[in-house]
């Protein structure tokens, strides 16, 4: 005779779900860090940004 399995608790479900989210976020963070490095070193060819010489309203 078949016996129903115990139901997975909400906390267990949340732990397992967060594990997958963490892995995805780590990958995204790695890409963002790589892009930031290429911008700071001047090697970025696909990202355009404006460079300001002086900040407006500076006290110096």
Curated annotation (Swiss-Prot):
InterPro entries: Ribosomal_bL32, Ribosomal_bL32_plant/cyanobact, Ribosomal_zn-bd. The keyword Ribosomal protein applies. Pfam families: Ribosomal_L32p. It is found in: Plastid, Chloroplast. One of its GO terms (cellular component) is large ribosomal subunit. The keyword Transport does not apply. SUPFAM superfamilies: Zn-binding ribosomal proteins. One of its GO terms (biological process) is translation. GO terms for molecular function: structural constituent of ribosome. Transmembrane segments: none annotated. It comes from the Eukaryota. Keywords: Chloroplast, Plastid, Ribonucleoprotein, Ribosomal protein. Belongs to the bacterial ribosomal protein bL32 family. This is Large ribosomal subunit protein bL32c. It comes from Psilotum nudum (Whisk fern). The lineage of its organism: Eukaryota, Viridiplantae, Streptophyta, Embryophyta, Tracheophyta.
């Amino acid at each position: 005779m078949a016996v129903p399995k115990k139901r997975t608790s909400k906390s267990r479900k949340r732990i397992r779900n967060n594990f997958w989210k963490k892995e995805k976020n780590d990958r995204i963070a790695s890409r963002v860090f790589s892009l930031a490095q290429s911008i700071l070193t001047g090697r970025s060819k696909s990202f355009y940004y404006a460079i300001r010489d002086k900040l407006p309203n500076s006290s110096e």
